[in-house]
Regions:
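Residue-level preference for the first positions of well-ordered beta-strands
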Residues: 74-78, 113-114, 149
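A short, basic N-terminal segment
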Residues: 1-69
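Conserved nucleotide-sensing/catalytic segment adjacent to the nucleotide-binding pocket
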Residues: 124-167
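Post-Walker A helix-loop "phosphate-sensing" segment adjacent to the P-loop in P-loop NTPases
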Residues: 97-114
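Walker A/P-loop nucleotide-binding motif
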Residues: 70-93
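Conserved catalytic network of the ASCE P-loop NTPase/AAA+ motor domain
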Residues: 70-71, 106-109, 142-145
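A short hydrophobic beta-strand->loop->alpha-helix junction that borders the nucleotide-binding pocket
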Residues: 111, 116-126
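Conserved RecA-like P-loop NTPase ATPase core
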Residues: 47, 118, 153
Length: 167
């Protein structure tokens, strides 16, 4: 039997041998968020070896710990750096996971409360949607206004041509 994606982040109070209410509800909310299933397991994050990102790490950890307050106050966050591979997407994933873990007991599972949008995929989906129906673009369009938390991942990773940008 595969290990539950919540195993390291669960007190096992909402399950028995045959079912887990929390896993079912969190799984449904994660699916609605469009976060790929391979990212449902909470990953550990550490600071750089030299500690250069310690203050940013502490700030993001504090936001994660107080994610309900952060979202309810309508705060925004833009994670950026000069390079890749330094944890921006990992932190964005952790924040989506934290929010869903915060709201799952009260959520009625009829609204998409968080969205994880891979920006280049979304832009391509919008282009594709001109010639034929694109389910990814339509889903985001239909749920963007109701989501309390929206992550635009890799927003600056791929620059389009001048033609693409001006369309």
């Amino acid at each position: 039997m595969a290990e539950c994606f919540l195993y390291n982040n669960c007190n096992h109070r909402h399950c028995d041998d045959s079912c887990c209410i929390r896993k079912d509800r969190v799984g449904a909310l994660l699916k609605m968020s469009l976060l790929p299933e391979k990212h449902w397991v909470r990953m550990s994050l550490i600071t750089d070896f030299d500690g250069t990102d310690l203050e940013e790490f502490k700030r993001l950890f504090n936001i994660e710990k107080n994610i309900g307050d952060f979202v309810s106050k309508g705060y925004s966050l833009f994670l950026h750096s000069k390079g890749s591979g330094n944890g921006k997407t990992s932190w964005a994933i952790r924040l989506v996971q934290a929010y869903i873990n915060y709201i799952w007991p009260e959520s009625d599972l009829t609204e998409c409360k968080a969205l994880f949008i891979h920006t280049s995929r979304f832009l391509q989906a919008l282009k594709d949607n001109f010639s034929s129906k694109n389910d990814y673009a339509i889903y985001i369009k239909n749920h963007l206004d109701e989501a309390d938390l929206v992550v635009w991942d890799d927003i600056g990773a791929e620059m389009g041509s001048d033609y693409d940008i001006n369309q």
